[in-house]
């Protein structure tokens, strides 16, 4: 049993970081301050370098994802980045989910509608699929089959397809229009449409079951009780079978005359169009209840007499019109009387007979347009055409041997001769008169003198010289514009190069600050490792055998104390000098970078003014008839060249500063490497010594 275990001696508790720092400061050992933050002048360039840094990976094709960090890989495998998504967005809570679930349940229940007039949630009137087959026993005029007890406006009739809502047990042959077999009526539970059902089922209202495939073909859609006129036309419309089942439908008013007989029509009523050409041509658009002054199938706008384009058609054969030749293109199509026709109203029959009497004149297609007087506008221009016809004789008597300028002369006209001679005068003669030579006598001579030829040659040479001068001017202007463009491009590239150099030097400044921080930390490690060496030696001395008594020499205690003080003083001075050296290196690096980044960019307004005057004075020897634009180009060329020269000087300074900074940082990095290796060895030795102590 050991002595420590016998006396139950426990090892002391380890000190915290703060306690250790305080203890080191009490014995005079330097520590790192946690409250003071180092001042950084080039932190922005550090962030700039961090943003532009790219991680380069090497991977075979198809295995790039395995080289990425796990966080990035999980993010990619998850949901894609949403630009509208924010970190402040909260997730949906359980309470919100319950509210949403309750809301959906209320929407699914028709009786849960709070507002009796609201149609926003579900529609009980209109079916999105009007031809979809409904359930058996469903209401005939309900698209959803649900009666809305809160909103009575929703319980009205629906205008869907009856074939989709029929009973499944009904006979399919009842809807196929089999001849000789009556149609099975549709059960309608809605009491509002009983009158319409009775009108459809009553044969007196024109409900014909033969050769029918649509129950709406013979019924009067606009009628509730069913008028006699609408029923008659509905009966006649049911005979004609066309491509549209609604061709025979009557849109007349249901309040027409009720006087009906069972006798057939003695005279067939002629109709304009059949259902094969126009499926809605047989529809009647009657308006006033109780008044039916037109037969069914007629045009409701035919009574407008003011419009010349509507006077041609009423019910049957279109008569010839003197104002509109396009109203005679329809052929007569009469319906033969058949048994079982409903006799229309007497007023309608009389009106139809009157219209047939007016349309007795058939159009002769062999008639000439002049005889028919079809186009009225031909009369308007007839007088003008006759006038041109009278003058056509003069064109036939045209003299083909006459010259172009040969025209009739009016000898009595004032100033005729001078004006005519002036018109006939050649261009070159008028130019000679303007220059002051070449009179009428000279022209009559037929030759030119030597002086005239010499003057013409001088004028020609002068024109050539002017053209050459203009060409030189244009060439000078073009060269100057090209020079301005070249200087602009050169200045732009020089500015880009300067910006790149400044960014590089700024990042080197940030790197210099980081190196200084590393050097300070290594210095603290070295100081504390020296104190650790002393503590390890003292611990080894105290942990020796209990029988080995260590007694110091009492005669040299003063000398040992003096040596220790000198050692502590020298160590402190060494640490201080090392810290000053590191600060000096950082200061030199900062001054070097700041001197290269700033300076030389200031421009004085006074200097710019005198520089402009100097440039314009020096450019006059090269300018010819200069204008304001020419002066501006000269000034811009000189300014750009001056800026390029300044940027070139700054680029040289940046290059030199960058080279010096790189050399300095390389030396510092080598020192850091050496100190790091040395400290690694010392720390390893202290660890080994502590392990040997038992």
Curated annotation (Swiss-Prot):
Residues 477-539, 631-693 form the t-SNARE coiled-coil homology domain. Residues 65-95, 193-203 have a biased composition (Basic and acidic residues). It comes from the Eukaryota. SMART domains: t_SNARE. One of its GO terms (biological process) is vesicle fusion. Signal peptide: none annotated. The gene is SEC9. Disulfide bonds: none annotated. One of its GO terms (molecular function) is syntaxin binding. The keyword Cytoplasm does not apply. PROSITE patterns: T_SNARE (PS50192). Belongs to the SNAP-25 family. Residues 269-290 have a biased composition (Polar residues). GO terms for cellular component: fungal biofilm matrix; plasma membrane; SNARE complex. CDD domains: SNARE_SEC9C, SNARE_SEC9N. Keywords: Coiled coil, Protein transport, Repeat, Transport. This is Protein transport protein SEC9.
């Amino acid at each position: 049993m050991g002595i420590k275990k016998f006396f139950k001696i426990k090892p002391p508790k380890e000190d915290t970081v703060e306690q250790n720092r305080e203890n080191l400061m009490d014995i005079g050992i330097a520590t790192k301050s946690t409250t003071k933050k180092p001042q950084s002048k080039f932190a922005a360039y550090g962030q700039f370098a961090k943003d532009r840094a790219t991680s380069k990976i090497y991977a075979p094709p198809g295995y790039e994802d395995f080289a990425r960090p796990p966080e990035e890989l999980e993010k990619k495998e998850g949901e894609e980045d949403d630009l509208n998504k924010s970190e402040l967005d909260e997730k949906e809570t359980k309470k919100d989910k319950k509210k949403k679930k309750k809301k959906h349940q209320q929407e699914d229940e028709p009786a849960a509608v709070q507002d009796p007039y609201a149609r926003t949630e579900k529609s009980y009137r209109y079916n999105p699929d009007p031809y979809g087959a409904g359930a058996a026993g469903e209401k005939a005029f309900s698209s959803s089959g649900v009666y809305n007890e809160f909103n009575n406006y929703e319980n009205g009739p629906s205008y869907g397809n009856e074939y989709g809502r029929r009973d499944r047990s009904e006979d399919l042959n009842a809807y196929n229009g089999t001849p000789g077999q009556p149609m099975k009526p549709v059960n309608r539970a809605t009491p509002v449409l009983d009158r319409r059902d009775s009108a459809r089922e009553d044969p007196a209202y024109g409900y014909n079951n033969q050769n029918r495939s649509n129950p709406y073909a013979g019924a009067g859609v606009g009628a509730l009780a069913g008028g006699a006129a609408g029923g008659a036309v509905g009966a006649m419309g049911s005979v004609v079978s066309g491509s549209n089942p609604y061709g025979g439908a009557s849109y007349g008013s249901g309040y027409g005359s009720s006087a009906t007989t069972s006798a057939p029509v003695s005279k067939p009523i002629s109709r304009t169009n059949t259902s094969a050409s126009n499926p809605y041509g047989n529809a009647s658009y009657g308006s006033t209840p109780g008044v039916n002054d037109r037969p069914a199938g007629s045009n409701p706008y035919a009574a407008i007499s003011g419009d010349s384009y509507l006077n041609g058609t009423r019910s049957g054969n279109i008569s010839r019109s003197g104002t509109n030749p396009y109203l005679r293109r329809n052929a007569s199509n009469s319906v033969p009387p058949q048994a079982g026709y409903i006799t229309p109203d007497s007023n309608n029959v009389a009106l139809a007979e009157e219209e047939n009497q007016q349309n007795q004149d058939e159009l002769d297609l062999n008639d000439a347009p002049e005889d028919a007087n079809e186009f009225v506008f031909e009369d308007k221009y007839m007088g003008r055409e006759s006038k041109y016809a009278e003058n056509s004789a003069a064109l036939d008597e045209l003299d083909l041997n006459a010259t172009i300028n040969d025209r009739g002369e009016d000898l009595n006209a004032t100033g005729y001769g001078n004006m005519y001679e002036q018109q006939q005068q050649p261009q070159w003669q008028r130019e000679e008169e303007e220059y002051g030579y070449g009179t009428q006598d000279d022209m009559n001579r037929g030759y030119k003198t030597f002086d005239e030829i010499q003057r013409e040659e001088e004028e020609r040479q002068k024109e050539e010289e002017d053209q050459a001068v203009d060409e030189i001017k244009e060439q000078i202007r073009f060269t100057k514009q090209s020079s301005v463009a070249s200087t602009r491009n050169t200045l732009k590239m020089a500015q880009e190069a300067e910006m790149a150099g400044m960014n590089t030097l700024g990042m080197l400044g940030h790197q210099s600050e980081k190196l200084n921080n590393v050097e300070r930390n290594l210095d603290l490690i070295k100081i504390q490792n020296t104190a650790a060496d002393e503590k390890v030696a003292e611990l080894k001395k105290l942990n020796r055998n209990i029988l080995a008594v260590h007694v110091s020499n009492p005669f040299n205690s003063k000398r040992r104390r003096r040596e220790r003080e000198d050692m502590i003083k020298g160590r402190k001075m060494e640490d201080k000098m090392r810290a000053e050296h590191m600060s000096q290196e950082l200061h030199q690096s900062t001054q070097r970078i700041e001197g290269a980044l700033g300076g030389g960019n200031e421009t004085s307004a006074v200097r710019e003014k005198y520089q402009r005057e100097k440039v314009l004075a020096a450019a006059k020897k090269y300018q010819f008839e200069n204008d304001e634009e020419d002066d501006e180009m000269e000034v811009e060329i000189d300014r750009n060249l001056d800026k390029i020269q300044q940027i070139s000087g700054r680029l040289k300074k940046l290059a030199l500063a960058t080279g010096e900074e790189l050399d300095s940082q390389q030396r510092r990095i080598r020192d850091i490497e050496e100190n790091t290796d040395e400290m690694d060895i010392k720390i390893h030795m202290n660890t080994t010594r502590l392990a040997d102590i038992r």
